[in-house]
């Protein structure tokens, strides 16, 4: 086990001091597992308003931070990030999960068509309703999308824990990222079901989103089924701490 480490150390010691410093500063050669950048690199700030703000309006602290960034190491901005007003990290995550075979152009097009279909359906419902009912109809597709996913998020999940040679499904509270992931996964899985093969993806997804927005549909039922299973296994909840 020690031989490879000694070999690497000798290889590093054979390099000149200037070469070693240059290699250590290269992000692609930094010895950090699964990371392109070393811990010294800071996350990029993708905000046009921050850079458009004149220097005269900055506070002393903001001036110091801006001057400090001139000498700091900054990570490259991700290719999918943008400073557009339409940028939504949740929709971007949903688009990436919906993507198949790396065809992000198609996934993004389907997402745009889905939001357009949601808006068309809500406006049709709005114009067909009475004056009193129009005030209760939500027409913003972004608000409907976020609320639909929020309604699909489970609060408690099941985790297999080995105890006495057997695996038990133990109920545990889920973190926010896991809740959001399950809601998106269930929504996409239901839309890819083979029951309605002739229905296009934007039409199916918009229908599922509107159902989830009103706390209805198979995705909401799937969340309730998971909660019922967690309630049935609540006697095993103490296995979390063992």
Swiss-Prot record:
GO cellular component: mitochondrial inner membrane; mitochondrial small ribosomal subunit; mitochondrion; ribosome
Pfam families: Ribosomal_S7
UniProt modified residues of type N6-acetyllysine: 208, 228
Record-linked InterPro entries: Ribosomal_uS7, Ribosomal_uS7_dom, Ribosomal_uS7_dom_sf
TM segment ranges: none
The organelle targeting sequence, given as a residue range: 1-37
Subcellular location: Mitochondrion
PANTHER family listed in its UniProt record: RIBOSOMAL PROTEIN S7
Subunit relationships: Component of the mitochondrial small ribosomal subunit (mt-SSU), essential for mitochondrial protein synthesis. Mature mammalian 55S mitochondrial ribosomes consist of a small (28S) and a large (39S) subunit. The 28S small subunit contains a 12S ribosomal RNA (12S mt-rRNA) and 30 different proteins. The 39S large subunit contains a 16S rRNA (16S mt-rRNA), a copy of mitochondrial valine transfer RNA (mt-tRNA(Val)), which plays an integral structural role, and 52 different proteins.
Associated clinical condition: Combined oxidative phosphorylation deficiency 34: An autosomal recessive disorder caused by mitochondrial dysfunction and combined respiratory chain deficiencies of complexes I, III and IV. Clinical manifestations are variable and include congenital sensorineural deafness, lactic acidemia, and progressive hepatic and renal failure.
Name of the molecule in the record: Small ribosomal subunit protein uS7m
């Amino acid at each position: 086990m020690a031989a490879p480490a000694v070999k690497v150390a000798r290889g590093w010691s054979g390099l000149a001091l200037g070469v070693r410093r240059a290699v250590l500063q290269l992000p692609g050669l930094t010895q950090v597992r699964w990371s392109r950048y070393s811990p010294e690199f800071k996350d990029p700030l993708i905000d046009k308003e921050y850079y458009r703000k004149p220097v005269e309006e900055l506070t002393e602290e903001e001036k110091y931070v801006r001057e400090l960034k001139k000498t700091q190491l900054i990570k490259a901005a991700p290719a999918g990030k943008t400073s557009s007003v339409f940028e939504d990290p949740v929709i971007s995550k949903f688009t990436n999960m919906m993507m198949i075979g790396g065809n992000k152009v198609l996934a993004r097009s389907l997402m745009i068509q889905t939001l357009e279909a949601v808006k068309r359906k809500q406006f049709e419902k709005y114009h067909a309703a009475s004056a009193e009912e129009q005030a209760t109809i939500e027409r913003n597709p972004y608000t409907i999308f976020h609320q639909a996913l929020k309604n699909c998020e489970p609060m408690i999940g099941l985790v297999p824990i080995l105890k006495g040679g057997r695996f038990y499904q133990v109920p545990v509270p889920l973190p926010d990222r896991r809740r959001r992931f399950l809601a998106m996964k269930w929504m996409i899985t239901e839309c890819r079901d083979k029951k309605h093969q002739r229905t296009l993806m934007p039409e199916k997804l918009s229908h599922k989103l509107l159902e989830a927005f009103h706390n209805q549909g198979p995705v909401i039922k799937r969340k309730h089924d998971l909660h019922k299973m967690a309630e049935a296994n609540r006697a095993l909840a103490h296995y979390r701490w063992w």
